[in-house]
Curated annotation (Swiss-Prot):
GO terms for molecular function: oxidoreductase activity, acting on paired donors, with incorporation or reduction of molecular oxygen. It comes from Salmonella gallinarum (strain 287/91 / NCTC 13346). This is tRNA uridine(34) hydroxylase. Transmembrane segments: none annotated. GO terms for biological process: tRNA modification. Keywords: Oxidoreductase, tRNA processing. Residues 319-328 have a biased composition (Basic and acidic residues). The keyword Cell wall biogenesis/degradation does not apply.
Amino acid sequence: MPVLHNRISNDELKAKMLAESEPRTTISFYKYFTIASPQQTRDALYQVFTALDVFGRVYLAHEGINAQISVPQSKVETFRQQLYTFDPALDGLRLNIALEDDGKSFWVLRMKVRDRIVADGIDDPTFDASNVGDYLKAADVNAMLDDPDAVFIDMRNHYEYEVGHFENALEIPADTFREQLPKAVEMLREHADKKIVMYCTGGIRCEKASAWMKHNGFNKVWHIEGGIIEYARRAREQGLPVRFIGKNFVFDERMGERISDEVIAHCHQCGAPCDSHTNCKNDGCHLLFIQCPKCASKFNGCCSEQCCEELALPEEEQRRRRAGRENGNKIFNKSRGRLNSKLSIPDPAE
């Protein structure tokens, strides 16, 4: 019987990936469609992906699939063909290719079955997730940005918006997608007569959000096809002005893709212009925050003097201090302090 999960340590896997000579391509994709048996589908896809040396993070649920992966460049076309023939619903599926890619985005394949491919918190049996808003392509996005009757809504989390967003886009201040949905409805009541344009990283969140807005009585709703990644790629290919400002946060080891030269965020320690996220080097903290090179040197990669001091302690003492401590990494929010999260790099499904 084939092994359908990883048995090698993260350190060993990462070292193996870093030693690879063949370049890799980072790809993301999603599809809302009915999967009758998510576990069986997961196990079958796991065998397909491992045979092609695919790394990454894949979620499956009855409502569909959500994936961020890394594929050896020589196997990208084979991967595409096998994905398209795996299920008729996946035939011709758009694959978002990373805008900036060092090939080191993932080093292990993790595939999980979940209740939802995006945790939306929706518990309304009358909600029709297929009744989505209209798609906007790159040229349409730019036209909408110049339309005074249009309102752009960023359906990403606060730490994503902080480092990059579309011109004049509204932020829905929240730490997770499930918190954003009811807030978006509330905040946009005063714009009910406007054209609502929703966007996110790759399209999966804004697609469901557009259906939620329509469910709540908003009639003029659009969302950007393929999200920021597809927009920036197509705008560049077509010689259009790229109207996204700053960096696009991504949920892998890269933590960001440069879209424009502007740096709109600031170091969380000294306030200098900076948009590079990192995790606190103290294993008992792992706070996700923005740190400039000067502060990284000053604090040895830590978020505070306290963590810097703890990192300098003998490993045994560090482990003792971590024991019993709330185990969960955190995300820095300037308005609310430290927020709990389960991953060093936040979970894209949240």
